[in-house]
Amino acid sequence: MNIYITGLGSGYEVEHLVRLFYPMAPLTLTPPEDGADCVWAEKRPDKLWAMVRQGGKSRTVEAPLPIPVEEGGETPEFALASLTYDLLRSWTGIRPPWGKMTGVRPVRLVHDKRAAGWTEEEIDDFFLKRFDCSPEKYGMAKAIADLQEPILKMGSAPKTYSLYIGIPFCPSRCSYCSFVSCNLDRDRKLVQPYVDCLCREVEAIRDEADKAGLMLCSIYIGGGTPTSLSAAQLRQLMGTVRDCFDLSAIVEYTVEAGRPDCTDAEKLAVIREYGATRISINPQTFSDEVLENIGRKHSAQDILDCYAEARAAGHDDINMDLIAGLPGDTVEGFEKSLRQAIALDPENITVHTLTLKRASRIVIEDQKENDYADVAAMLEKCHLLAEAGYRPYYLYRQKNTLQNLENVGWCKPGHEGYYNIYIMEEVQTILSAGAGGSTKLVADGGKRMQRIFNFKYPTEYIQRFDEVLERKKGVAVFYDHDLGTETSG
């Protein structure tokens, strides 16, 4: 299946709406050959036209050109995208649960519309009628927006910020992963020089934040796999963080403990000793077969043992990640994993939907309708979380997620992950340290924003570290109301 769009400036919306039904279909720049499977969308001088052809059968639809936007109409691109969406919904029998929405932050839309003075009825119509969003998905987004409001008010106070520290090393690469990470065995010689530079960057961030008069709100050490560092390296890094910042003044300090094959009792004790208030242990699944399919080098029992060690070390706010749609998993298998996670009684359970990234090892062709039903049925099992006392507190979506579904963080009341909310709703400055780090500066209630990028790969980050420090000086400059220029590596 190919996508061909003509007559529009970009066709971005049409392209991504087609991928709600055919996730991996490529966009072509030339008309499809006669008889070839395709979705063809076209803005003609006198009308809008769309066709789907598959397996020797085809269907076409057309509509008048929309009236101009300034007269209350739609843009030609949105009108053509809607026409194509209706065609493919009828052709495939699939109703995407988020309807025509291709954006990754539906909860942010609720916040934005409320801030703009829209009534609740107008917001309802926007989601349910204009975008054909299902009542269930919209209801979840709206409930999450309600829960987030007091947290966002605190996090969006002037000159508050969160600190992200990235560890781009893993013991092995999971087949679904597209993040830049280095194999620990192959690149072990980089780890200590990287940690040394990282500590210096944390100190530089402290200095720049102080110059700008910023107040630290939360800390998140992620990856990669932060516990791929040795216990001594964790002490070095977290000791630097403790020396630089008043940890008693922040609302949250998270460390991704991640995988049990590189997390042990000593590292868990270090994480607790140096001030972390929240950790994440991420099984993804409790099926040994599925763990092997995705390239994990540990068993489900190892996850249980790691969780027990974390509790023994005194960790009292634990998140566990699961992924719906992993290779070889089933609805029954996913439900079993979900029940196992609930039985462990962590404070947070985050349910992700598998995302098809070109940089990952998983290569999946167009999803069949039964695949759609399986992944959707997996997420329907999340009612078990609500029944166990968890509630959804943040939600986001990614491009090329199976069947346009979502990732949702569930928590027990009072255990919302603040950093997750702040970064998803984009209300707060995030200062990032480490390879691949993306600092996002926010001021004037979100009216001014600027990004500062670190070099992507650890080797380049280490070799050009002086440039990393020089770029961080842009933080204080930004808050002096001199925007400067966006810099990237």
Question: Where are the language model's segments positioned?
Answer:
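Key residue(s) within conserved catalytic/signature motifs
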Residues: 143-144, 176, 255
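Canonical Radical SAM [4Fe-4S] cluster-binding loop centered on the CxxxCxxC motif
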Residues: 159-195
